Amino acid sequence: MSELKERLLPPRPASAINLRGDAGSRPSPSGRQPLLGVDVLGLKKRGQGLKSWIRVDTSANSQVIEVDKFTMMRRCDLPARDLRLLDPLFVYPSTILGREKAIVVNLEQIRCIITADEVLLLNSLDNYVLRYVVELQQRLKASSVTEVWNQDSLELSRRRSRSLDNVLQNSSPDYLPFEFRALEVALEAACTFLDSQASELEIEAYPLLDELTSKISTLNLERARRLKSRLVALTRRVQKVRDEIEQLMDDDGDMAEMYLTEKKKRMEGSLYGDQSLPVYRTNDCFSLSAPVSPVSSPPESRRLEKSLSIVRSRHDSARSSEDATENIEELEMLLEAYFVVIDSTLNKLTSLKEYIDDTEDFINIQLDNVRNQLIQFELLLTTATFVVAIFGVVAGIFGMNFEIDFFEKPGAFKWVLAITGVCGLVVFLAFLWYYKRRRLMPL
């Protein structure tokens, strides 16, 4: 037991061992046990909790960084409970959380933090994590090439176009922001992983169930029990992913919260707007963005400035609401696509569960049939035993020790045996006729 504790617990610092030895060698004058020394620096180093993270930026560049928990919390503006979702030592259900500056994704093996500029994953040797990183880099590189091509075509169309409408129509390329592309790869990886597990379970289940219907054995029943346990666990995981996607699709506020690029642009725009200094007055007119003094300005100018500010604020709010609606529609279409995929996987597992239930019902019917046959055979044996008991009664009566003249006749034994046999046969046939009439036995 002591050896196991030494292997599990971290090694003691040398300073603590030295202090303990010194304290043990010098007893206290009051007779009390001396206080043991504590290596504060060693505790501080162990308390930092540096973890290795894989960072993927918008340019598809990846690097390994070592960051502690508190630095990561400040960097992504996340609470500690969200970081616990990413810890591989704990088992949490699938979750997608939209925060102020990040999206926390916990989908099967894919556990990452998505921001507007980067994706952070715990450094792991899991193949699914490495495949996610490679697939994300390929998607980002492909999207960057597409954006360059769209910009070139946009510049060419601007040069050739003569109207302003054509320029406005071609000035907004249709592509997903960085966080949605990273979320899409995570959803695709999770859905593909769950669908592959469901397919493997189907390949293993259907032949086993078909064999079980024809041959019921202890080995096949044990395999079917294990298969059903795996099916229930996989169905629970698929159902959780489906419910999480459906919950996001039903809540427009959560979907709007996940649009990190737009929030970052608005924040930067507000900062730039606060830092800019407007020109207040020219020679004979005033600027619309200049503050109007209530003393020096006439009432007409104040009313005009107030009406213009109201119109401008309404226009900005309407434009932001339209952008939010469009962004929600983009994310909703993305989630809806993978909702269909995960719902198809769930339907596949549901069909397999129904097939298992049908097989169980068929096996129960077979067992009931065998049980009924055994009961019928037992009833037949009981009837035959009753008929044989009649012979025992006759033998007991004639076996009594008293004088009868019937015993002295030479053909008496044959007559007794024949009459008893005929009576027993009649009784047995009467029982069979009764069983057939009551449909207790198929005869």
UniProtKB/Swiss-Prot annotation:
Keywords: Cell membrane, Ion transport, Magnesium, Membrane, Transmembrane, Transmembrane helix, Transport
InterPro entries recorded: CorA_TM1_TM2, MRS2-like
Motif (Required for magnesium transport activity) on chain: 399-401
Region span, Disordered: 1-33
GO CC annotation, single: plasma membrane
Gene3D superfamilies the UniProt entry points to: 2.40.128.330, Magnesium transport protein CorA, transmembrane region
Family recorded in the similarity comment: Belongs to the CorA metal ion transporter (MIT) (TC 1.A.35.5) family.
Miscellaneous comment as given in the Swiss-Prot or TrEMBL entry: Has the ability to complement mutants in Salmonella enterica and yeast lacking magnesium transport capability.
Function of the molecule: High-affinity magnesium transporter that mediates the influx of magnesium. Involved in tolerance to Aluminum.
Name of the protein in question: Magnesium transporter MRS2-10
Organism: Arabidopsis thaliana (Mouse-ear cress)
